């Protein structure tokens, strides 16, 4: 009975209140950050992406949730900006190229360095291992191990294996983010 009441209450809220969340998307260059933004915004995959110079901001509406998404460049010269754009967001989305095992160590180090910043304490993190459609791509369990995600104890952390190209697990990723925007305000 309580579950039915909560669903009815959520439906009623959706009629009258829009929810907003702010996310920052970071990760090494060529991991698929901008592709992810395009796929969730339009459902379209484009093979010919140009690397993000600096940052892009995009607003995406999914149902009654408006997502303000900061897509920050992953080249070394832009990584010092990551912390600034991660402050005060609902969640940090950290993109990893799961098929490029040569960059996993660097990706792990950048993630842990970012999360060591006191200003980002407690902000939840969603790690996405992109390009699962490619041969040799790490699965979720391997990503958790190689990225040393179990060492992150001061915040909620979640990891999914996705493919922007095949649109694998994009829906569950969005569900986690939207649910998370609700729990952050409660």
From Swiss-Prot:
Name used for this protein in its record: ADP-ribosylation factor-like protein 8A
Residues reported in the UniProt entry to bind GTP: 29-35, 71-75, 130-133
Function field: Plays a role in lysosome motility. In neurons, mediates the anterograde axonal long-range transport of presynaptic lysosome-related vesicles required for presynaptic biogenesis and synaptic function. May play a role in chromosome segregation.
Record keywords: Cell cycle, Cell division, Cell projection, Chromosome partition, Cytoplasm, Cytoskeleton, Endosome, GTP-binding, Lysosome, Membrane, Mitosis, Nucleotide-binding, Protein transport, Synapse, Transport
UniProt family annotation: Belongs to the small GTPase superfamily. Arf family.
Gene: ARL8A
Pfam (any one): Arf
Cellular component terms (Gene Ontology): axon cytoplasm; late endosome membrane; lysosomal membrane; spindle; synapse
Record InterPro entries: Arl8a/8b, P-loop_NTPase, Small_GTP-bd, Small_GTPase_ARF/SAR
NCBIfam families: small_GTP
Lineage per the UniProt record: Eukaryota, Metazoa, Chordata, Craniata, Vertebrata
């Amino acid at each position: 009975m309580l579950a039915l009441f909560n669903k009815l209450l959520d439906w009623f809220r959706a009629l009258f209140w829009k929810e907003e969340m702010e996310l920052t998307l970071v990760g090494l260059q060529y991991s698929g950050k901008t592709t992810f933004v395009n796929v969730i915004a339009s459902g379209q995959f484009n093979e010919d992406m140009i690397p993000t110079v600096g940052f892009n901001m995009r607003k995406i509406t999914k149902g009654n949730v408006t997502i303000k998404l900061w897509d920050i460049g992953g080249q070394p010269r832009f990584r010092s900006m990551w912390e600034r754009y991660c402050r005060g967001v609902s969640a940090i989305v950290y993109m990893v190229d799961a098929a490029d095992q040569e960059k996993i160590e660097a990706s792990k180090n950048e993630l842990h360095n970012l999360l060591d910043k006191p200003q980002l304490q407690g902000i939840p993190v969603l790690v996405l291992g992109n390009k699962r459609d490619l041969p040799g791509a790490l699965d979720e369990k391997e990503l958790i191990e190689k990225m040393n995600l179990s060492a992150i104890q001061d915040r909620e952390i979640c990891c999914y294996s996705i493919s922007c190209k095949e649109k694998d697990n994009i829906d569950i990723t969005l569900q986690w983010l939207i649910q998370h925007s609700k729990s952050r305000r409660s």
